[in-house]
Amino acid sequence: MLLVSCLIILLHLQNALSQIIPPNERCVTAVYTAYEYLSFSGQPNKGLWAPRCRNRLHVLSIYAASDLYCSDAEREAGFAQLDDQCRQYAGVDLIPRQEFAPNLTHEAISQMRVVEFGELPKKGPLDTPILISKSYYSRVFRTIDAWQFELWSHYAFGYLGYAYWTVVIAAGALHKLVLHAISVKRAPSLPPFPFLLLIYYWIQTNLIIPAPLASSRRRLLWWTFPGRIHAIVVLLFWILSIVLCLIGYRTFSDNIYWPDISAQLLRYVADRTGILSFANVPLLWLFAGRNNIFIWATGWSYSTFNIFHRHVAWIATLQAVVHTILYTVLFIQSGNAWKKMQKPYLLWGTLAMLAMILVFPFAVDWFRRRTYETFLVLHILFSVVALVGCFYHVIIFEDHEYWFYLWPAVVIWVSDRVLRLIRIVYCNLHVQLGSRSRFQCTECVAAYDKDADIIHLELTPGSGLQPAPGQYYFLYQPFRLTGWESHPFTLGYWSYNDGAPSTQCRSLKRDTTTDVSEIPLLPDTPSSGSDYGSIDTSTDPPERKLALRFWIRPYDGWTRHLRDQCLQSPTRIIQPNILLEGPYGEQCPLWKYESVLLIAGGTGIAAAVPYIQDHILRSSTGQTSTQSIHLVWTARQPALLRDIAGRELKQALSRKDFRVSFYVTSESASQGAIMDGVEFACGRPDLQAIITAHAEEARLGSSSVLVLVCGPSGMAGLARAAVHQAMRWGCRSLRYVEESFDW
């Protein structure tokens, strides 16, 4: 996908450069362009290229003026180019210079009439060769030179955007590499250049970890960013995009195309913004894809690239709007604006611009979170309309040179959809030779817990997936009217069952369920979502089936529909047809840190439990450096705490290296016990105090510490601010990881 897109863009670069007239050809080009404002008698005298190539008076005048104003090298290159264009566009050869040799002597040229620009009307045919004056030639040359510079700058500035994101991605990949190196080589074996480590810690403390502003608030202007580095990357691209639209314009008052400087600026800026908008189209589709290779290369989340996607979309849309407005002004100034606007390619361009604008009202957080299905349909519809409109808008250009910006988007979109389909088949269909049922598909049980307001979803996939912490899947309910929609959920827990899921999702047969912590630890193998390694459970007993568990909070749309389906059952348990797509996500090497603090809010516990599972599994054979884990979990309903603490966390609660702090925010709750020996407190935790104490304890013990947070944005903002403060106070062995999914 990425390789094909890069090849298309490189071909576009080659094609774009071929449109730029080389400097050694511009002298002759300026000469024959100047003669387009004069008319000569004789044949041929119709069209653009035929008179320029075969009208004897016209061609003789071009040769004569070139002898005066061009060097030998410029004449050789320029006339070779003109001859090629005569064959390409007129199907004829340029009249050779030898046929005019007697008329091109110094004496003959000196006797030719010299004219200034605008001195002779174009409609009056001339019956003698004419020389253009030096000022006439200079004026045309400056015009062509300025136009060629503008063409070059339009393309070059578009590629500057690609260069910017290349640097950003490279920095992200380097950061991932440094993180891996630091987690492997701890304090006893620091790198030979400690000042490089100090620079890295300074970047972490001042650029990567903090909130966008000094406070813990995530809003900057009217945008939301998880961290300061996200805001910096986005704002720099905004600045770059604005600057590239404002600089690099060569204007002068004698321009033969647009004598008025304001008209020159209107045309140049209109072209610049249109081309830059097109240049952003491949980035738009690349950053929106689930199967984005840069997610793996950098270790950044899908949410991070989604932030980039939104801002590139904002910029591309504003550039398209400016492009449309400025061309409308140009049409009004030149007259017959309404007639020009009725041309099909302009109507397609206007439609594309309007579709880009209409995407935004339905993509705001408020609308997207409440009516995700509607947002998804409209987002795809308007995006396709915009892309098709862009194709037809530039169909009038030779060689379809601007399609090179659009085809990568098509390739990226198709490739991403094909890879999604492959993942769906892999996750949900499994062929077993020699068994009674050769084809096995995903089986599902969903149960709604009214007290906890949670849907417990357990799926037995049809393939040999290797679950790991940090994974998330997209879920489809294919037999709904909108069955093509998918919704992301973090994998909360996994186990191995004898046969299909129980018909009582929350009362699974305990004698036929094997917790992964009871399975012998196998050698580490890299997982699909991590280069740190994961636990390989692929050799489990063949009679046991993997069961994946998800906790879903019903809101609007599909989750509410699933809850209503459960409520229609007397037992609140159903067996819907649900398909998996995945796994996605990156596993954090939690086992390489001596102390771990897990902070979860509500169903954010799904991000923490798999790491606890993984820790129990690794600690049974000593394949972990983690000595203590502290889980701080806040939920609205005590029932949710009680349910998961009594099942998924039951084994962990009996361990000495694991402790919990449960908080209930419901106003009707009173302090009490979740289960025997496990209590909860009312209200919200003091994350500042908890993180500070944890970091100080780790600093005094010279141990590494990791803080992993998954919860509401307010909770994550407070945790990030507390971690930032601890790092400023000198806790350099502290790492912050935020698990979130924003769509």
Swiss-Prot record:
Induction: Expression is repressed by iron in a sreA- and acuM-mediated way. Residues 503-540 are annotated as: Disordered. Glycans are attached at residue 103. The keyword Transmembrane applies. It comes from the Eukaryota. Keywords: Cell membrane, Glycoprotein, Ion transport, Iron, Iron transport, Membrane, Metal-binding, Oxidoreductase, Signal, Transmembrane, Transmembrane helix, Transport. Its main location: membrane. It is found in: Cell membrane. Residues 525-540 have a biased composition (Polar residues). Residues 1-18 form the signal peptide. The chain crosses the membrane at residues 154-174, 193-213, 229-249, 275-295, 312-332, 344-364, 377-397, 402-422. Residues 411-590 form the FAD-binding FR-type domain. Disruption phenotype: Reduces ferrireductase activity and decreases biomass production during iron starvation but not during iron and copper sufficiency and copper starvation. Increases sensitivity to hydrogen peroxide. One of its GO terms (biological process) is intracellular iron ion homeostasis. GO terms for molecular function: ferric-chelate reductase activity; metal ion binding. Ferric reductase involved in adaptation to iron starvation and which is most likely part of the reductive iron assimilatory system (RIA), a siderophore-independent high affinity iron uptake mechanism. This is Ferric/cupric reductase transmembrane component B.
